[in-house]
Amino acid sequence: MQRVTLTLDDDLLAALDALSARRGYHNRSEAVRDILRDALNQDPPSPESRRGYAVLSYVYEHEKRELASRLVATQHHHHDLSVATLHVHISHDDCLEIAVLKGDMAEVQHFADDVIAQRGVRHGHLQCLADD
């Protein structure tokens, strides 16, 4: 492991300490390592790490003009990426879907973009984890 020195503004250090306390980190280094891992996982994958896992979450209006059918068609079109999907009715009008995906990260990103771009889909978020 390498030792690195960081210079932080007082406000940023206070926010890091508050985050560390909330999450139960034993020291700042653990918190910074996790923050960096999260940031690196959000960065587009490099050519060396083209495969991995991802979680796609989104909310959609299930009665929006054929939206549910379009989403199912998109999922079936990319069936090779799907590991599992969780569907939750969060209100009379809205559903939350969480899809666990595995495969080529460019294809995963394309699938997520197709889903999130659908009219009626809100709060779309893709969390990627490239294979090490």
UniProtKB/Swiss-Prot annotation:
Residue intervals passing through the bilayer: none
Domain of life: Bacteria
Cofactor: Ni(2+)
Residues that coordinate or bind Ni(2+): H76, H87, H89, C95
GO MF annotation terms: DNA-binding transcription factor activity; nickel cation binding; sequence-specific DNA binding
Listed GO biological process terms: response to nickel cation
Key words of the record: DNA-binding, Metal-binding, Nickel, Repressor, Transcription, Transcription regulation
Cofactor binding note from Swiss-Prot or TrEMBL: Binds 1 nickel ion per subunit.
Family: Belongs to the transcriptional regulatory CopG/NikR family.
Subunit structure: Homotetramer.
The protein's role, per its UniProt record: Transcriptional repressor of the nikABCDE operon. Is active in the presence of excessive concentrations of intracellular nickel.
Protein name: Nickel-responsive regulator
